[in-house]
């Protein structure tokens, strides 16, 4: 049964990482637990999954494959809403990525910046999903009323349904997306939008997470209120920002984020100040 659990759900998080890199294992664990939580798995179920992994790592230590176990998220923290990043913090991270590019001339840092800007611009689920977007999966439509160009992405085979469409923030559409397109101007329509020169999407994501974790720790941004903020926290930023700007649009935010209003409350908003502020405004409206 333990092998079945691993192969059915967990292997995709661990099969392409270097087990000797403790931080990579920790990042994979956080991704796994975050997705189990968002799938509405109970504490008991999540504990069973982490027990399987704990036994696996103990066996690996015993056989000299790894030197130590990665850090396992504590259950009391698993159940809390994940702290988001503030916009100015994400800007700091982007600035640092550009500095790393200037220092190393490695364009992977620039494309990591593209990835962060993409997932903060719309209701994407951070992970492999945004990396699978190909050039033919975006289009522009014109809002006849405002004459504004709206950028629409079409995702296939998502976590919850076979096809999902979402729109991007206008700032991203006008200022960031053109930069992404010109980074690889000769790409064909069936080429990946991000990191088109890399075939293995899992390896790309693993490296993105590794860079993100290192830089946010160096900047003193990885932890907030005693909790870690992995790359998935950017999804929380997007949802909370949209809610703060327009609390009446909760159903639209849920639809754009490919989830339900119930999930938005339980996993993104209920434990956050943005919800408390909005409820305060409703309780004590200014006359």
Locations of the language-model features?
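Short, Lys/Arg-enriched alpha-helical recognition elements, typified by the DNA-recognition helix
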Residues: 1-59, 73-76, 94
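Catalytic-site neighborhood detector that most strongly recognizes the C-terminal catalytic loop/helix
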Residues: 84, 157-161, 257-282
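Short, charged phosphate-coordinating catalytic segments
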Residues: 58-67, 119-149
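Conserved tyrosine-mediated DNA breakage-rejoining catalytic core shared by Y-recombinases
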Residues: 131-176
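C-terminal catalytic core of Y-nucleophile DNA break-rejoin enzymes
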Residues: 157-178, 189-214, 230
């Amino acid at each position: 049964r333990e092998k079945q659990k691993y192969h059915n759900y967990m292997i995709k998080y661990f099969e392409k990482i270097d087990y000797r890199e403790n931080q990579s294992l920790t990042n994979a664990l956080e991704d796994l637990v975050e997705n189990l939580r968002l799938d509405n798995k109970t504490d008991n179920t999540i504990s069973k999954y982490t027990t399987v992994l704990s036994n696996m790592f103990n066996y690996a230590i015993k056989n000299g494959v790894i030197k130590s176990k990665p850090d396992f998220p504590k259950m009391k923290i698993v159940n809390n809403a994940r702290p988001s990043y503030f916009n100015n913090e994400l800007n700091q991270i982007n600035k640092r990525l550009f500095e790393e590019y200037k220092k190393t001339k490695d364009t992977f840092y620039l494309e990591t910046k593209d990835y962060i800007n993409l997932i903060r611009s719309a209701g994407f689920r951070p992970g492999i999903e945004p990396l699978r977007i190909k050039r033919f999966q975006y289009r522009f439509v014109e809002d006849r009323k405002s004459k504004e160009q709206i950028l629409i992405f079409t995702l296939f085979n998502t976590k919850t349904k076979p096809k999902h469409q979402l729109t991007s923030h206008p700032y991203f559409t006008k200022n960031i997306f053109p930069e992404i397109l010109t980074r690889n101007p000769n790409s064909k329509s069936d080429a990946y939008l991000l990191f088109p020169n890399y075939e293995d999407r899992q390896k790309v994501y693993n490296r993105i997470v590794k860079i993100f974790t290192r830089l946010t720790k160096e900047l003193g941004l990885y932890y907030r209120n005693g909790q870690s903020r992995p790359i998935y926290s950017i999804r929380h930023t997007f949802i909370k920002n949209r809610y703060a700007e327009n609390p009446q649009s909760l159903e639209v935010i849920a639809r754009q984020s490919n989830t339900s209003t119930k999930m938005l409350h339980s996993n993104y908003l209920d434990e956050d100040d943005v919800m408390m502020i909005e409820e305060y405004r409703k309780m004590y409206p200014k006359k």
